[in-house]
Regions:
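Membrane-lumen/periplasm interface segments of multi-pass, membrane-embedded glycan/lipid transferases
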Residues: 21-50, 219, 223-278, 391-418, ...
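Transmembrane alpha-helix segments characteristic
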Residues: 119-124, 151, 169-174, 212, ...
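Membrane-interface transmembrane helices that cradle and orient dolichyl/undecaprenyl
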Residues: 151-167, 177
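Transmembrane-helix signature of polytopic, membrane-embedded enzymes
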Residues: 71-80, 99-127, 146, 160-169
Length: 557
């Protein structure tokens, strides 16, 4: 949203107008990163937003509305406002995906009764990445999937009712889907090939000219700003296919990124298409949809970073959702047609099939509710190990991402040593090997617990009486939450109980007798009064906050 604000204030894509530090350049394979800020690209003396510009441009009207209410991604001193950024993103993303849910409903009503149409909306909007990813923040897919969903709706309306396809509108929607997320080039190709079968020569020419016009404008934008035909993010050189088969299987069946695990309703849709293929209409459209789905799975498996970094589930496959919704509608229509052909005679399969579908739908909604609501699923990406540094975690069935916060992570194979008089700074990444579960990401002064239980693990080379000095403070809300009671256990044995009512960071010593210490130790904090700021009406934070810890240090006795 900062780029949107820059376009409003300065009519420029250069972010130099704002108080953004020019950090030492980090040479990435495809661009020059501004220090450790992957979102920013250095081009000569200028700073640009590395991610696609389409979302920022389309969001300008909404940023103007936010500005009218005093909300901005830029503070009065021209520095970045994380509060303004997240506030605008969360509201806009939720609104856009609500519009997409309406599009899904009207798509379904073209072919299905009201009840089935509502089930399609629940599955498409709540049982997919639309809820857990695209509605939570302004990802590149958020605008793109809405634009593409409208295109699919227009195509289905033509197939069912013969509704006129507006050539320039379709061309423009597809162009802007590409400007917001270049992976949608796959879907543009699929739709373009499909249109060859239904358009007249004159319509094809108009469609091609619309695409050429938008493409020319984009090349001019890129050349003016970067002296390149395409911006860095859009170049195909980012695809390497070095771990293709691992990536493809991971994108399909891994417990923390697999499409078939997070959206098992896809399996139900595939069954419908096969089982009722004789009653299936619009088979040409089905073929294009399946080809586009397969192509995107191949492309996203070509990235070295195929798991999508610190994200939830199959984020990189979000663009498949409109196709899957379309196939679901066609499959359900074929199922209903089959029933009519049999005279609506009830059989055991008649009842078993809807039950199986509803069961898979309920599981899909549960999985994506976890990603949308539980902060523990976000913390999973960094604790107990950073998934970008240990991507093997994606395959660990002992704690799938969607069960983070419900299941503790497996006990680490390696427990870091904690030398005496060595302070663990909880604001740094160096502290993370000591944190097992129940912790949030680091903040400037401390790190919050995010559940009623949180643990620290450490190993000792010498066992003797120790005192652990913990610098911490409780989460308090005047008049609503006046103290936090903290019970501390070492290796399952109670050490102390504290009543914390001082809101300032304070050092609390905890005695650790030699007879309770082991070579490998687990220190557990139980905070029964942990609560979310949102539940107490003091903010939008849904994390279950108990205490915040700044540091911990072992002192020999």
């Amino acid at each position: 949203m900062m780029l949107s604000q820059c376009l409003i204030n300065y009519r420029s894509f250069q972010l130099d107008h704002y108080a953004i530090p020019h950090l030492p350049p980090t040479l990435r394979e495809d661009y020059v990163q501004n220090g450790d800020l992957y979102q920013l690209e250095q081009v000569g003396p200028h700073l640009y937003y590395f991610l696609p510009p389409g979302s920022s441009i389309l969001s300008v009207p909404f940023v103007l509305v936010a500005n009218a209410f005093g909300i901005s991604a830029v503070k009065s001193d021209n520095s970045f406002s994380i509060e303004g950024e997240t506030g605008i993103e969360a509201s806009l993303a939720a609104f856009l995906m609500a519009v997409l849910a309406a599009v899904f409903f009207y798509m379904a009503r073209l072919m299905l009764p009201l009840g089935y149409s509502l089930l399609v909306v629940v599955g498409g909007a709540l049982g997919t990445q639309i809820w857990s990813t695209a509605s939570r923040a302004m990802f590149t897919d958020t605008w793109a999937v809405l634009l593409f969903g409208i295109v699919i709706f227009a195509v289905l309306a033509y197939e069912i009712n013969g509704t006129r396809v507006r050539v320039l509108l379709i061309g423009s929607l597809l162009a802007w889907a590409y400007f917001t997320a270049p992976v949608y080039a796959i879907h543009i190709a699929a739709i373009s090939l499909y249109l060859l079968f239904i358009f007249t020569a004159r319509q094809i020419l108009a469609y091609a000219l619309a695409g050429i016009g938008w493409a020319a404008g984009f090349v001019i934008y890129s050349w003016h700003n970067f002296s390149e035909l395409l911006p860095s993010y859009f170049r195909p050189g980012r695809l390497h296919f070095r771990a293709f088969w691992i990536a493809l299987s991971g994108n399909l069946i891994s417990p923390s990124r697999g499409l078939l695990i997070f959206v098992p309703t896809v399996l139900f849709v595939v069954y419908l298409l096969i089982r009722f293929r004789a009653q299936l209409k619009n088979k040409r459209l089905v073929a294009f949809a399946l080809a586009a789905i397969a192509a995107q799975l191949i492309v996203i498996s070509g990235f070295d970073h195929w798991w999508g970094g610190h994200s939830y589930g199959p984020r990189l496959a979000t663009g498949l959702v409109p196709w899957c919704v379309l196939l679901g509608i066609l499959g359900l229509k074929a199922m209903l047609a089959s029933r009519e052909d049999r005279g609506n005679v009830a059989t055991s399969r008649t009842f078993a099939l809807p039950f199986a579908g509803l069961l898979l739908l309920a599981f899909s909604v549960f999985v994506h509710a976890r990603g949308a609501i539980s902060s523990a699923t976000a913390v999973w990406s960094v604790l107990p190990a950073n998934v970008d540094q240990q991507p093997a975690r994606i395959w660990d069935w002992r704690q799938p991402q969607f069960l983070a916060g419900l299941l503790p992570p497996p006990f680490p194979a390696s427990v870091p040593p904690l030398p005496t008089r060595t302070r663990i700074d909880f604001t740094t990444r160096e502290a993370e090997p000591y944190l097992w579960y129940g912790w949030s990401s680091a903040e400037p002064e401390s790190r919050w617990t995010s559940a009623t239980r949180a643990t620290i693990i450490f190993s000792l080379s010498e066992i003797r009486p120790m005192a652990l000095q913990i610098k911490m403070a409780p989460f308090l809300v005047a008049g609503k939450l006046e103290e936090q009671r903290v019970s501390i256990k070492l290796n399952g044995q109670s050490m102390t109980e504290l009543s914390l009512s001082n809101p300032d960071l304070t050092i609390y010593p905890v005695l650790l007798p030699a007879n309770t210490l082991r070579k490998r130790n687990t220190l557990e904090f139980h905070i029964s009064g942990a609560a979310s700021p949102a539940s107490l009406g003091v903010g939008a934070d849904e994390r279950q906050l108990g205490i915040r810890v700044a540091s911990a240090e072992l002192i020999p006795q």
